[in-house]
């Protein structure tokens, strides 16, 4: 069983590796745990290595590989995932956590239809009060279970903020080859773009950079209970 600091360090290393493909520096690890010196990080890494959670890569400075994560780690811990801002009660009940602004729902994200091609909105929903009103938003109904380990379930209505850029690790609406839209986690590395599901049963899809266009970033969702 890992100590709290060992677990937190392991999850931080995993998060950095998944976001950038590069191990965090000892300084970054020290700061993440609010430690005063790097010697404590050295001890924690040695303990994680002895227990079989990480491995130091030979001939590479500061290179670590996460071999496994603790069984007590949640899906959010493992995937550094979007933590959904769920509007309780869904769309069928009066909710005080809403403001007067409404946004369009443009269809289903798993339908393979690019957002620009959807001319007629399906419905309108209130914009959650925690989101900035000056952004451009739209909703999409989720079909399928490819993002369940990020807390996104089939039947949810995801709220997307329009944007043509996104940081590594963000969940986005990605348009593939100008005709297929996907809700995936995006990671760019070199001359490739990876679109990751949050479900171990689905493979990561790899594309050239000219084949993928970001149409928006996931910011919230509605869920009917």
UniProtKB/Swiss-Prot annotation:
It catalyses: Hydrolysis of Ala-|-Gly bond in repressor LexA. Residues 26-46 bind DNA. Signal peptide: none annotated. The record marks 111-112 as: Cleavage. It comes from the Bacteria. Keywords: Autocatalytic cleavage, DNA damage, DNA repair, DNA replication, DNA-binding, Hydrolase, Repressor, SOS response, Transcription, Transcription regulation. GO terms for biological process: DNA repair; DNA replication; negative regulation of DNA-templated transcription; proteolysis; SOS response. The keyword DNA damage applies. The active site is at residues 146, 184. Homodimer. Represses a number of genes involved in the response to DNA damage (SOS response), including recA and lexA. In the presence of single-stranded DNA, RecA interacts with LexA causing an autocatalytic cleavage which disrupts the DNA-binding part of LexA, leading to derepression of the SOS regulon and eventually DNA repair. Belongs to the peptidase S24 family. This is LexA repressor. It comes from Pelagibacter ubique (strain HTCC1062). The gene is lexA.
